[in-house]
Amino acid sequence: MNRRSFLKTIAGFTVGVAGAHLALPITAKCKMLAPVTEIVGKTFLDRRIKNNIAKLKQANPWLMIGETHCHSIYSDGTYTVDQIMNRAANLGLDFLIITEHVTPKYFPLEDSLTSIRERWRCCQEWKDPNLALIDVYPAFEVSTEQGHLILVMDQDYLKPHNLSDLRTQFSPCEKKMVSMEKAAKMVEPFGGVSIIPHPDIARSYPFGVPISFIKQNLTGLVDAIEDISTGHGFDENYSEELGMASIGSSDDHFNLIIGTTVTGYDSRRHKNFLSAVKARDTQAIKVNDSLDDLMGMARMIL
């Protein structure tokens, strides 16, 4: 199926969901779209992403690439942790950061901790001899007073006996929205980094922190910022101006667009993603633009 035929086939369904925009909450619309995304992934997108990633790695053998922003059923995603891990590994990604929401009244911290526990379990039970285990990290996407902030911790905090430390540290974030400055500092004891997702994108609630606020309050405090996002349709160079690490991601909720935009680092210079971010030595990379037109339609209804 070519790109034009694919878009024509699903356009009617997408418009139908758009017609229900006011009547349905986002979780219901996500469930309606899930069957379509399953078809898209299997018949149209997976091969394209996988081939492009393989070419990218062939040209840059030391490059490690991964998804740094996506969601599972433990927040507002539609797929399980093991499904996301398996697809990411099949696509050829080296690392994966699932970023469940922590939002007062909506997304409790305990669900995010369960998601982290699932990542650990999947790693321990990985049995496919033909598929290398993908590197995963513990992480949250915290709702703050100024907007969302992704916090990524050292991999040691995937281990179940360390989850109580995360629970103690981050429990204030599910009781009320803290300032972004406070949230950024909370990750430091865990050897982690902070990432500003979808900057400067306004919603009716704190979502994308304004660039003006970042310049005045967050430079030197937050480690990284999304420069390219498939899910939100922007391609910028915020990181250079702000002195932060450059991040590329999808903000995938359907296990569909993972791998279309990635973050890369040189494995000769850094042992892992956290090391590269702290050194401000990462790059945002657009891998596949096949669904850019579709994502434009999706942003109107989700």
Give the predicted meaning of each segment.
Residues M1, L22-A54:
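C-terminal segment of N-terminal export signals and the immediately downstream linker at the start
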